[in-house]
Amino acid sequence: PTTRGFARYYGLADGCCNFFNPGVEARDGEGLPGRKGQNRLRRWAIEDKVIMGYTNPDKDFYTTDAFTDYAMERLVEYKDEDKPFLLYLPYTAPHYPLHAWPEDIAKYRGKYKIGWDEIRKQRFARMNKMGIIGPNHKLSERASKAWEDLSEKQKDEEDLKMAVYAAMIDRVDQNLGRLFAKVKELKKWENTLILFLTDNGACPEQPNTTPNIPPGPVESYRTVSVGWANASNTPYRRFKSTDYEGGTRTPFIAHWPGVIKPGMTDQVGHIIDI
């Protein structure tokens, strides 16, 4: 990134990684970090140095937290700049693998046992009520087996997957709160344009390389199921890696106090517009 216009950089220089330990070496008292494949080394970059297989010695390391810590340090470092500056903070959450802190997972355990069919119906109704979608919108066909066709054991396993997924998003929310608090502390809130978006729809890919380890801890490498990816993309069809709206249409939030008026738009846009 530092050869492509960024003055500073810290973080992943690849598509995804283990959230607790992006490297290949186990820390004391932990098992080997779950990986997508034994021959898959993830590139990590600190400023202009690229590291293949980065293991942070701190057992409290978690990428979403670490990215935010670095971002907040840069806000302080550049607070007296005369020119506007860009802070690009690309969290990998909630991309697989499913990794989250136990206390965050506990908030959501059991909340998804109603299943993806009911979740899709509830979200569709709420989106209609909020005016996010119009009255002519229809809920897409289910892209997986019916929730009721699963055994009780399978339902519990699926509930855990989605609880971890939700916990990952919860942690993003917590960290954005920390970041915004820092912007306000530096008295930059009124002069800061915030753009928040995701790169694609939810993912149906299944590189579950640790099928015998439940999702959540450093040793695991698990993903959500197709049914949950389908529910996450309500009301659209299909998922990431397809040309359907479930893969290509994503939310976008722009915030600038006193400049951007509250409201919604369905105007077509693309990342290149930014």
Residue ranges with predicted function:
Residues 1-5, 79-83, 187-190, 228, ...:
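Extracellular/periplasmic catalytic domains that process cell-envelope and extracellular macromolecules
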Residues 62-79, 110-134, 154-192, 202-204, ...:
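A long, amphipathic alpha-helix that forms part
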Residues 17-21, 46-53, 177-181, 211, ...:
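Substrate-binding rim/cap in mid-to-C-terminal beta-strand-loop elements of soluble/periplasmic
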Residues 1-105, 109, 114, 143-166:
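Formylglycine-dependent
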Residues 137-142:
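Short coil/turn segments at secondary-structure boundaries
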Residues 7, 173, 191, 199, ...:
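Acidic active-site catalytic centers that drive phospho-/nucleotidyl reactions
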Residues 1, 8-11, 85-90, 193-197, ...:
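Structural recognition of the beta-strand scaffold that forms the well-ordered cores
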Residues 9-12, 16, 130-133, 200-204, ...:
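Phosphate/oxyanion-binding loops and surfaces in catalytic or ligand/nucleic-acid-binding neighborhoods
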